[in-house]
Every structure is written in C-alpha cells, then in structure tokens.
C-alpha cells in the first residue's frame, strides 16, 4: 500500500474528556469554586485574546486596501436624473470597522487625509500624518502606562451629571451600577483575590471621540500596532489586574451608567489640533447628552480579556422582543442576557462583541420597572383609574406568568394590540417557530451584562426596507401637518421637507435609520404615497453615542413590494449574501491537470482509476462498491474531490472563498461559492482522471462490523453521474445502489451503537440543525422528507465526517477544525412527550438512545411527535478549534464524539480547510502550519455567515410557499390543510404543517372562544367555540389592513365574516401546491358560484363594513358553544392565508372552527 495512506486505528483517538475529570492545570478544587460557576480554562481565554489580535492585525492590513462596490450607487441630489454620475462608486465598507469608522481614500495620500464631518465640510480630528508627532507619542505612553493607585480611590466623592441636558441645577446622584456578584467571598468570580475568573472592569481614560469610534482616533493605528507587537497577554491564572488612569468623565460614564441612560454624562466632544492640544467645539454640541456608552479602545481589550474582565462572544437579538439580546461565549455555560438597547450599545445581529458582566438581580429589577412603567402609561391613556393602573401594571409585569394573557381557563388579560401585531409580523415571516424568551423570577438568566466594544461586524453593508417621511409612530403621524409647517418655517422655504427621512428596515432587529433628505428621490416629498410600496437598499454610515438612531446612506431602489424577485433580492442583502460577481481574473487562476496526470503526482497518490466509481446527485464525491470472494463482505469507497490541491492557501481565490464561506442555496436561485468555471475544473467529471481524498472501508453486512478502514490521497476515473431521481427509481433493480443503501444502514447502526432496524428517513429532518438543506431546489415532497437514497447518502457522509475528525484529533488535537452541537439544556418537553406516548426516554438518555428510539418507532404520529419536539429543542451547530478540558466538542444531533465537514469542498470553505489539515497529516507534519489565530478567525466568520445563510434559506422557503398560497387564495379562497399538534398550553397551541414545513404558535386570544380549560396532567386543552368565523376573528384582532387582505376580504368574506370559498388541500404536498398555483382553475374548491352570484356577493361585501369591534361582539353569541379537545399528536384542520403586501411575505394560520366542519 502507498506510504501516504494511513490505516485508521481507534486506539490512537483521544477520548472525550469527562467533565468531572481533574485537569492538569492550576484548576481550583471543587471546594474553592464559587457556587456553580464553571472554571475557565486558560486556553479558552487565550483563544479569545489571540482571535482579537488576529482581527486587529487584519484591521491594520485592510486599511491600506480599497474595495469598490460596483452594484450600489448612492442617491445624490438627483439620483433619478438622466445625468447620473458614473464615478459615484462607494468603497466597500470594512467589516472589521466599528460603526462610524471611515476608510482611507486611495486617491489622497494618507498623510493629508482627514476625517470629514456630517456636513461634508471641515474636520473632526487631526490629520493622519500627525500620529507620528512626539507630542502624540508621549501622550499615548502616558495614557497606557500603569499606575499604582487603587480603583476605589477614583470612585470616592464622584458626582454624576444632571439627568436632563440643560438642567438649571446640577443634582448629584449616588446610584452606581454593580458588577456581577461583587462580594467579600475570596472565590467570587469578580473578587480581586480570585485570579481564575472575572474581575470588575475599570474605566479607561481617553477622549470620548476616540472611544466612540476607535478607528477614527488619532492613536488608533499606533495603539493597534502597539498592542499587536508589544502587548503579550499573560496567563489569566496569575496575572493581576492592570491599573489604568481615569478621568472624571470616563469614570462617570462607566460607573454611573444606568440601563435607561438617564444618568449618563454629557459628552466632552473634545478635539485635537495639529500640535496635539485639546480644543473644544461649539457650546451647542456640548448640550447633546450621551445615550450610549463610548466603546473601549481596541488597544486595551487584550489586557482586559486576558485578566477575565471582559468576555468575547456573538450577539443575537430576540426576534420577538428586540429590546433583549443574548451573547453566546465559549467561556460560560449559558448565554449572557443583554437588557435593553442601552446595554446592547449600538450593536447588530451577529456582531462579535466584548461584554462586561453585571448584577443579574439589578438588571431584572430595572427591566421590571421599565415594563411596569410602559404598561402604566398605556393604561393611563385608556382612561383607567390610578389604583387600577398600578395594580394591573404590577400584575402584567414579568413577575407573574399572566403576562401572555391567560389564567387557568379564563381570558382574563389579552395581549395588547401592539404585542399581537408584533408577534404576527415576526412569526408570520418565518418558516419555523420563533420562541419569545419570557423572563420571570423563576426563569431569570444566569448571567447579565452590557456591551463595551464591537470587535467584528460580519453582517453585510446593506439592508432592505422602505422609506417614511416621518418617524413611524403615532405621535408623528397625528401631527404630520404641524411637522410639515415647522420644517417649512425653519428652512425658510415653503414646501421644503424635513432635513432627514426615515428608513424602516425589513428586519426589525435593525433600528430605524436616519437618511439625509438630499439622498432621496426628488419626488419623494411631493408624492410620498407613491413610495410606500417601494423597496430600497440602505446602509448604516455612523452611529454616534448621542443619537438614538444611526445615520445611513440610501443606495438604490430594487423594486415594488409583492414582486417575488424583489423579495429574493431583499433576502440576499439582509442576510449578507455576496451578490457581486466574481472578478474575471479568478475564473482563470485554476486549471485542471493534464491527462495523463504527471508521474510525480501519481507517486504521491493511491491509484484507484481501475475502480468503477459513480456519482449520485453531487459532483463533490464519488462512490465505488467491490464485492469480494467472501459472502456478505464488501468494500465501499468514498472519494472526495481534492479541492485544496487546486485552491492554494492565501491565493486570491482562497481569500474570496473565505469571504463567501459557503454556497447559498435558495429556491429562487443560488449564490455560488466559487466561480462557475473554477467549480467545473475542480469538480469530479466522468471520463476524466480526478484527484481525490479517499476513505475505503471493508464491511461485513451480515455481522454489521467494520473489518478495515483506510484514508489517503488518491486518483480516480469516474464513469457516470446519476441524479437522485434516477437513483431512487432504480434502487430496487440496481445491485450497486442496493449495496450503497445496505452500507448506509450498517454504518448508521455502528454510529448509533445499536443492532435494531432503523428508518433512515426519520433522521433526515435533523439536517436542519447542522446548516442548509442540501439540494433545496429539488424539493417536491415534504420539507422534512427526502428520497430514501438521499437519506442513505446523508448517513454515509456523517460516518465519513466522523472518521476524518477522529483521524485529525489523533494527529493535532489542539488545531483540528470541528463541528459541535451542544446537548440541549432542557429536556422537559421531550420527557413530557415520552411519558405521553409511552416511549422509554429520560433527561439522562444519550444521543444514540434518543435517535435510535426515533428511528425504530413504528407509530407514525409518535415518531413525528418525537422528531419535531427534539428538533425544536436542539441547538444550532457551530465550528470550533481543538479541545480542552473544559469544552464539549461532541455533536449531539449526529451522536458523534468528534465531527467535522469534509464531503463538500466545492460548496463550503471549511471543507477545504479540513483537506489542508489532512494534507499536513498525510505528510507527517503534526504541527499544522496555519496558526491558531487564523483558524479562530476562520471559524468565527464561518459560524456567523453560516447562520445567516441558513436563515436566508428558511426565509426563501417561506417566501416560495407564500407565493404559491397567495396565488391559490386569490382564486379559491382560504387554503384548508391538516396540521399536527406539537404542544398545548393554557395560552397557545403549537402546530406543524408537516408537508409544508410551516410551524406556528397559535395564541388563544386570536380564537373566538367563550372559555378554555387546560388539564396539565393529561396535556389536554378544552376549547369552547363561539362562532365558526375563526379566520375573520383572527384577522380583525390583528387589525390587518393591507391591500392584499382588503382585496381578499371584498372577494371572499361575506357580511358575517364567513369565507365563501375554501380550497381543500388536506393531504397536499409542496409539488401539489405548486401544481394548484399554476393551474388556471380553482383547485379542490369547496364552493364555486356562477358569475352573477359572484358579482352580487362582491357588491354586497363591498358595501358593508365587517371589520369593526361591534361585528366581533355580535359574533360572540351568534352560534351555540362547541367544546373541542386538543392534545399533542392530534391532527387538526387549519386555514392558511398568505399576504404579500410587505417586503417579506406573511402567512396567517388559524384553527378552523368545528362549527364550520
């Protein structure tokens, strides 16, 4: 055998460390640990420091580059005029730069370039050339030099600024914000005597303008380079906290910060002249109050992270409650709760941030007070008495479980109309469940904190949305005339609009963006109504600490709401998909090896060209099957294209692939990962010699054992390509395909450690938890199902990925790229389903036991209930580097101790990186050449963008379904379908339309009920129905008033709110839905009248108002009550309506009343 081939030996694979095992480092004993806080491994904190330094190094290198963005033309004074300037290309925004950072102009020498202020005239800082002045160098050394004074010495006798700008008398406040768990316990995580964990953050001296935007500061380049070359972080075990000089302004800013921003100090707004001295700007600018904390200087972050004062993690915003966010880190066992926009500090979804921990009890108390204040204000506007307002506000706060509106069968408190509409707009745009993380004293977060710096922003430069002349709130809409008069008076010109307009992003997690009025089309102010259905692209330009909203730039209009192509473009931009074309030079940088392959390359590889290899559904890898002389013993070969041989590290094509991360597969189209010509050259092609990395396994199909397994580089000669449809059609007649299917069953049994007969199709739905759905364009059945041959190939891929990861772990365990999926923290729902169905599962069940139980269950409803419940519980997978004694890197969903991505190198960048690691292992170089910091940067970028791409694919699926449903709604009325009940509660019903993949939580306050009762022991919900007009009740409760709904209401709803036509598609799948949408006649219409009847109905419905509260009240006693029992695992009838009157299509799903059945 070729010496480059490696025989797989399980004895060389390191075992997964036990959480209870004692590490060899200076880990404190269990008696010395504080509470249940986890011990922080030194390599985990060290990895954060190294990653930060890698970002700073990339920052300093990228500032000398200028990427052009040819697809976007910012609107100028006349954006739609014929004399459009061709040289208005904007430089591509630097993803590493915090908000407000500007990039140098390559046409201007750096020593003469100066930052430009908002008006475009004047400067806001010194020239870049002044950074080398002796004055600035001396000042930098004084700022970052340590001192011996204690932190408490600076905090005594401090006073905060007035709460309101311009207050007559400055009143001192003593309110200080506590850090997390500060106490006298020497082993407290924030105790100075405990060097093993977090210590309280000390304020930083420096100009407010520098901290607001580090890259605009005069010391930014000097500080970044100094931190990279002179600051070496020490071990967090023994290093003491550095003492840093403080100024009164920065002390007040960090110590007296409150969540509502009331006690934040005024900004100093200091600047520097050419000699380095401080100068003040106008007094008017000093009147602006800081609403957010300035960011910490980038140069100070490595020290703070190394001493445990700050944690680094990725920020995720709650989609339903956008004031709350969470930061996920590798250090803590649970996410860090971020309360409110002030603590989130101008960050966006997916940002890599630095967080300081705060006291959880104080954060929760502040949140409770804010919610009670909001509820009290809303109740006061409704005319309630003062006593009633106070009592109801306390009752409806987060301290009680009645916040969602139900209390043991009585509709005591319904959600506010704002809450109902917000939930509908968020969940209606989604394919899967959108859980609202409700906080109560019983379910308070374990950690809380606030953001003090943004390290990396991987999100795209643009987002989609609509324009509004005034800020979208009730007060502005009621006073449009006064706003118009005031703006005209202040400008001195009659009819001139305001100075700014508002951009409302389609993604509600992005705040409103202020756009300068000179960037909008000239006719926007005169014909504002013409732009209500226009979708634009805009980007955030800067976000100062004194502004509640960011300032942005308007780029272009992409079309009209309701157009499927416009929605597709919006998805691409909102989820950071790279829409620009590849440079032509990248298409010619890779050439296929000549045939025959040179002899020197053949000597390095195992020659498998004589094997009959074939491809099924993909050109990333090929298979071969050999039947030996022994009955039941076969040889299965999996040969993956060696893309890493062609795409060399650090070449331009490699850089572009690293930026794109992976291919984006959407139903409306795909965003390629590599140029088309390059992909064709490096993919496997039948009839050509191809370079591959092969894993060959010898299986005994009778005993289900692996006799031999080998891994190494090879050369193959593929003979044929078979589509998935053809493979499935010939599965019963083709011997090779049957052996592939049998091999998949054997390998899956080995992975799950069982000898039971498995249903591989039942495991397919968990592919959602590991990334994008493969072959999404070929979906024609259920979203959760695929061809049996496709399921078999998926299981073979999982086995191969596990073996590759295990082999790399045996070579260099500290640098191997792994794919981990953490075990769910809460198994309550799965245990409840197990008790309900009689399945033997518990919270201590292993992943193999859970998956085996699902794959062997015979009852279809029980299997679906277990599938969907577990899928909803599972965490998202992510990439990580190596292992440590405090980190779990196992893959829960696939039941693998080690897992990676290897089989699709033409679609994912991580697969190419894994191939490079394999090359190092084959060549006998255990010390992987790529440094640790670069690997961390790669995995962080891949994690964030992979999450964006998966959400984009889900949004694409939902948009496609809504277009089909909307087409049927227009012709045949509401779509009736069966739904599977997943869970019930006293406040909601969770249902899944299995064939479409639609998941919804139906709140009971949107159903026309007279009463309801929930039996917690039996998990049953009893609904007493008032009327059969359930769809009309739901739409009226949500106050839906869109053009799409109004057209539907006039055509199909009668005077009593009943739908005159219902399209019955109870057992339809996706392909049936597509056929029905394409047909010219109504499909499965329940009722169809003649032309005269339709005209009469349309006329009568158009003359009656059926949307008022009086009509809802009249419906309550119109029908006799009918009691319906709902339980998990039951099938119910639902009505579906799709609304395409927004940038992203909405779907409304409600239960069909049994009165109309």
Swiss-Prot record:
Renumbered to this chain, region (Disordered) spans 1-35, 159-233, 478-498, 1084-1113
Identify the enzyme class: hydrolase
Q: Which residues form the RNB domain?
A: 608-921
Q: Which residue intervals are annotated with compositional bias (Polar residues) in the record? A: 208-228, 1090-1106
User: Could you tell me where the Low complexity compositional bias lies?
Assistant: 18-31, 181-197
Q: Compositionally biased, Basic and acidic residues: which spans?
A: 1-10
Checking Pfam families in the record gives: Dis3l2_C_term, OB_Dis3, RNB
Instruction: Give the residue range of the signal peptide.
Output: none
GO cellular component terms? Answer: cytoplasm; cytosol; P-body
EC number of the protein: 3.1.-.-
Q: Where in the cell is it found?
A: Cytoplasm
CSD2 domain span: 501-574
Q: What is this protein called?
A: Uncharacterized ribonuclease C609.01
* Protein's organism: Schizosaccharomyces pombe (strain 972 / ATCC 24843) (Fission yeast)
């Amino acid at each position: 055998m070729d010496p480059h081939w490696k025989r797989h030996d399980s004895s060389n694979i390191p075992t997964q460390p036990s959480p209870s095992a004692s590490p060899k480092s200076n880990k404190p004993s269990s008696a010395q640990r504080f509470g249940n806080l986890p011990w922080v491994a030194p390599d985990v904190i060290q990895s954060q420091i190294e990653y930060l330094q890698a970002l700073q190094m990339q920052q300093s290198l990228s500032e000398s580059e200028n990427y052009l963005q040819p697809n976007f033309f910012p609107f100028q004074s006349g954006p739609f005029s014929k004399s459009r300037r061709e040289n208005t290309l904007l430089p591509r925004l630097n993803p590493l730069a915090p908000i407000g950072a500007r990039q140098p102009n390559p046409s201007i020498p750096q020593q003469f370039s100066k930052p430009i202020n908002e008006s475009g005239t004047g400067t806001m800082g010194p020239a870049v050339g002044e950074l080398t002045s002796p004055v600035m160098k001396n000042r930098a050394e004084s700022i970052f030099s340590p001192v011996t004074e204690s932190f408490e010495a600076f905090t005594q006798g401090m006073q905060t600024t007035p709460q309101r700008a311009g207050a007559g008398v400055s009143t001192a406040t003593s309110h200080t914000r506590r850090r997390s768990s500060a106490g006298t316990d020497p082993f407290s995580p924030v105790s100075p005597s405990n060097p093993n964990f977090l210590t309280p953050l000390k304020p930083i001296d420096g100009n407010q303008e520098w901290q607001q935007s580090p890259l605009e500061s005069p010391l930014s380049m000097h500080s970044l380079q100094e931190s990279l070359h002179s600051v070496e972080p020490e071990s967090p075990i023994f290093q003491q906290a550095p003492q840093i000089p403080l100024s009164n302004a920065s002390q007040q800013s960090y110590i007296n910060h409150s969540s509502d921003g009331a006690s934040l100090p005024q900004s100093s707004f200091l600047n520097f002249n050419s000699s380095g001295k401080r100068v003040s700007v106008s007094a008017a600018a000093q009147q602006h109050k800081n609403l957010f904390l300035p960011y910490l200087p980038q140069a100070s972050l490595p020290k703070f992270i190394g001493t445990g004062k700050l944690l680094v993690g990725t920020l995720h915003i709650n989609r339903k409650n956008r004031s709350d966010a969470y930061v996920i880190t590798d250090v803590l066992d649970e996410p860090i709760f971020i309360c409110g926009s002030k603590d989130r500090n101008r960050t966006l979804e997916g940002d890599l941030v630095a967080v300081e921990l705060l006291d959880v009890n104080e954060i929760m108390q502040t949140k409770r007070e804010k919610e009670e204040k909001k509820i009290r204000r809303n109740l006061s506007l409704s005319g309630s008495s003062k006593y009633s307002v106070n009592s109801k506000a306390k009752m409806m706060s987060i301290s009680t479980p009645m916040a969602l509106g139900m209390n043991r069968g009585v509709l005591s408190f319904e959600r506010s109309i704002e809450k109902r509409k917000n939930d509908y707009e968020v969940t209606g745009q989604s394919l899967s469940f959108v859980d609202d993380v409700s906080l109560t004293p019983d379910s308070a977060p374990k950690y809380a904190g606030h953001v003090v710096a943004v390290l990396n922003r991987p999100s795209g430069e643009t987002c989609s949305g609509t324009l509004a002349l005034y800020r979208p709130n009730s007060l502005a809409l009621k006073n449009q005339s006064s706003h118009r008069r005031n703006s005209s008076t202040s400008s001195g010109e009659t009819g001139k609009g305001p100075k700014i307009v508002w951009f409302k992003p389609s993604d509600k997690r992005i705040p409103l963006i202020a756009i300068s009025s000179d960037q909008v089309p000239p006719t926007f102010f005169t014909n504002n109504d013409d732009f209500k259905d226009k979708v634009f692209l805009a980007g955030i330009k800067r976000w100062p600490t004194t502004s509640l909203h960011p300032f942005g730039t308007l780029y272009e209009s992409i079309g009209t709401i309701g157009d499927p192509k416009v929605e597709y473009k919006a998805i691409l931009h909102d989820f950071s998909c790279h829409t620009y074309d590849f440079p032509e030079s990248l298409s010619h940088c890779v050439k296929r090896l000549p045939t025959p392959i040179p002899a020197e390359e053949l000597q390095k590889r195992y020659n498998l060209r004589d094997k009959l290899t074939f491809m099924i559904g993909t050109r990333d890898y090929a298979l071969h099957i050999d039947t030996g002389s022994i009955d039941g013993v076969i040889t299965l070969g999996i040969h993956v294209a060696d893309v890493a041989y062609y795409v060399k590290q650090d070449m331009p094509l490699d850089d572009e692939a690293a930026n794109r991360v992976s291919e984006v597969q959407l139903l409306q189209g795909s965003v390629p990962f590599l140029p088309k010509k390059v992909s064709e050259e490096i993919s496997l092609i039948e009839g050509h010699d191809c370079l591959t990395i092969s894993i060959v396994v010898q299986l005994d199909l009778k005993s289900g054992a692996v006799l031999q397994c080998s891994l190494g580089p090879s050369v193959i000669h593929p003979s044929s390509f078979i589509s998935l449809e053809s493979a499935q059609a010939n599965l019963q007649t083709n011997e090779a395909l049957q052996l592939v299917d049998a091999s998949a069953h054997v390998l899956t049994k080995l992975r799950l450690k069982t000898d039971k007969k498995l249903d591989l199709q039942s495991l397919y739905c968990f592919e959602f938890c590991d990334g994008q759905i493969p072959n999404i364009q070929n979906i024609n059945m259920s979203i959760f199902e695929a061809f049996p041959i496709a399921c078999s190939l998926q299981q073979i891929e999982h086995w191969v990925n596990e073996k590759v990861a295990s082999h790399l772990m045996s070579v260099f365990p500290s640098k191997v790229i792994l794919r981990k999926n953490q075990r769910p923290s809460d198994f309550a729902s799965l245990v409840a389903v197990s008790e309900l169905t009689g399945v033997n599962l518990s919270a201590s069940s292993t992943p193999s036991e859970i998956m085996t139980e699902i794959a062997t269950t015979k009852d279809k409803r029980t299997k679906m209930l277990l599938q969907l419940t577990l899928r909803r519980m599972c965490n998202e997978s992510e990439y990580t580097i190596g292992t440590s004694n405090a980190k779990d890197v196992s893959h829960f969903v696939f039941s693998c101790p080690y897992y990676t991505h290897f089989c699709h190198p033409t679609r994912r960048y991580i697969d190419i990186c894994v191939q490079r690691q394999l090359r190092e292992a084959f060549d006998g170089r255990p010390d992987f050449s790529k440094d640790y910091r670069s690997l961390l940067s790669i995995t962080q970028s891949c994690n964030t963008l992979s999450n964006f791409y998966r959400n984009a694919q889900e949004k694409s699926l939902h948009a496609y379904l809504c277009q089909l449903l909307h087409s049927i709604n227009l012709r045949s009325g509401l779509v009736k379908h069966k739904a599977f009940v997943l869970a019930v509660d006293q406040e909601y019903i969770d249902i899944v339309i299995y064939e479409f993949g639609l998941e919804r939580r139906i709140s009971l306050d949107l159903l026309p009920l007279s009463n309801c009762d929930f039996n917690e022991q039996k998990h049953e919900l009893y609904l007493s129905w008032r009327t059969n007009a359930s769809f009309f009740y739901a739409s009226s409760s949500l106050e839906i008033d869109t053009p799409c709904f109004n057209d539907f209401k006039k055509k199909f709803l009668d005077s009593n709110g009943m739908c005159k036509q219902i399209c019955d598609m109870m057992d339809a799948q996706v392909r049936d839905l597509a056929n029905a949408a394409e047909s010219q006649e109504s499909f499965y219409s329940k009722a169809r009248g003649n032309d005269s009847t339709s005209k009469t109905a349309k006329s009568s419905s158009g003359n009656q108002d059926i949307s008022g509260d009086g009509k809802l009240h009249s419906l309550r006693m119109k029908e006799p009550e009918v009691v319906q029992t709902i339980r998990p695992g039951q099938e119910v009838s639902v009505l579906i309506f799709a609304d395409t009157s927004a940038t992203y299509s909405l779907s409304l799903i409600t239960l069909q009343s049994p009165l109309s059945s």
